[in-house]
């Protein structure tokens, strides 16, 4: 099946900025992550989203993709011996030009399938409260992974037996064939289909691991989450992925954070936003109110005549920057609440206020009137 357009996969335009691409990736990767989405095609969609992001987030890869699409010669031909933008390893129809160079130069540039390889990376989705993301925490997580089988010590063979050289490839991990072409006879080398390139054959497999040399287990990992992580961000824990193959280094663990929304606060970067309601009297006459922050309640002076939508900044009351570059602020946005149920006395006072001309009133008698309004709205006599 033909690959979908990467821009279409992420749901962005071809002129999308890096930030727009990153935001789309975070949203979709969270939506289709197999740990959260149990749909049958979730894993495949997640893989497709990740592949699209890896290309479009890299300026060089994106430029090639915009020019060639999925037919990019550097991508399609597998990244082997490259010259002038072409990879000779991709011409399988001609019997493999890569093998010509291996024949002439002894295969020095070829990595054997049985050589050391880095272990696979693991992903773990972690849910944090709003406060945990802001202040960080230390915790232990359990991650499913593969470990060396204790029964066979990684050999894959039944105790008392041992792996033997593959009879098909004679331990080389590759099979050789010759092919006649218009250019002459070409030698082809391919991964051995019997041993999968390991060069080994296990006559009697380990009953515990079934010959793989590894068993699935859950391991506990101590993780220190830095203060200031945001929804969709990742934390790389080096060396905590799957074990390496044939002596290679282990993979890495990537922790993807999912931050729960807060009932009062909203976050944008390192800044926090909240709305506070004010009564008509508080907005008109001014007041001192207490505003909740992540660091505790603080007093905020509301000047007389404050309007709905007025924003106040509480410096340094936001979220710490995850890279240690200071602290965000908290923005308090005022919403003046219009009363819906008024007593007769309150209605009379408001009518009197309207007759007196609203904001054109400045003398002392009008100040006393405002005090009456304030008391009436507070239920005082």
From Swiss-Prot:
Any one Gene Ontology BP term: chaperone cofactor-dependent protein refolding
Residue numbers binding Zn(2+) 2: 166, 169, 192, 195
GO MF annotation list: ATP binding; heat shock protein binding; unfolded protein binding; zinc ion binding
Zinc finger (CR-type): 136-218
Matching CDD domains: DnaJ, DnaJ_C, DnaJ_zf
Recorded family membership: Belongs to the DnaJ family.
Cross-referenced HAMAP family: DnaJ
Record-given protein name: Chaperone protein DnaJ
Species for this entry: Geobacillus thermodenitrificans (strain NG80-2)
């Amino acid at each position: 099946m033909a690959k979908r357009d990467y821009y279409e996969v992420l749901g962005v335009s071809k002129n999308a900025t890096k930030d727009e691409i990153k935001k789309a990736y975070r949203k979709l990767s969270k939506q289709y992550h197999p740990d959260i989405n149990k749909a049958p095609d979730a894993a495949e969609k997640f893989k497709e989203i990740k592949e699209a992001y890896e290309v479009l987030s890299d300026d060089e890869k994106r430029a090639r993709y915009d020019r060639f699409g999925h037919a990019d010669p550097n991508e399609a031909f597998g990244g082997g011996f490259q010259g002038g933008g072409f990879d000779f390893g991709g011409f399988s129809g001609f019997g493999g030009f890569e093998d010509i160079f291996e024949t002439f130069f002894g295969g020095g540039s070829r990595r054997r399938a049985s050589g050391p390889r880095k272990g696979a990376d693991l992903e773990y989705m972690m849910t944090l409260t709003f406060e945990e993301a802001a202040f960080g925490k230390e915790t232990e997580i359990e991650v499913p992974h593969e470990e060396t089988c204790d029964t066979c010590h990684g050999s894959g063979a039944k105790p008392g037996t041992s792996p033997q050289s593959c009879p098909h490839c004679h331990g080389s991990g590759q099979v050789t064939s010759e092919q006649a072409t218009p250019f002459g006879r070409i030698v082809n080398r391919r991964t051995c289909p019997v041993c999968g390139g390991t060069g080994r054959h296990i006559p009697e497999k380990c009953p515990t691991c079934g010959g793989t040399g590894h068993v699935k287990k859950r391991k506990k990992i101590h993780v220190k989450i830095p203060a200031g992580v945001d929804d969709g961000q990742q934390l790389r824990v080096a060396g905590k992925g799957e074990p390496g193959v044939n002596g290679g280094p282990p993979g890495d663990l990537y922790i993807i954070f999912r931050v729960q929304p807060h009932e009062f606060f909203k976050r944008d970067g390192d800044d926090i936003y909240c709305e506070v309601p004010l009564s008509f009297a508080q907005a008109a006459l001014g007041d001192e109110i207490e505003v909740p922050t992540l660091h505790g309640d603080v007093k905020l002076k509301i000047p007389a005549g404050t309007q709905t939508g007025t924003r106040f900044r509480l410096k340094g009351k936001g979220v710490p920057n995850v890279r240690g570059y200071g602290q965000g602020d908290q923005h308090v946005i005022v919403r003046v609440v219009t009363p819906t149920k008024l007593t007769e006395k309150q209605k009379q006072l408001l009518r009197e206020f309207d007759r007196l001309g609203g904001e054109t009133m400045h003398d002392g008698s009008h100040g006393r009137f405002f005090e009456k309004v304030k008391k009436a709205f507070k239920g005082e006599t």
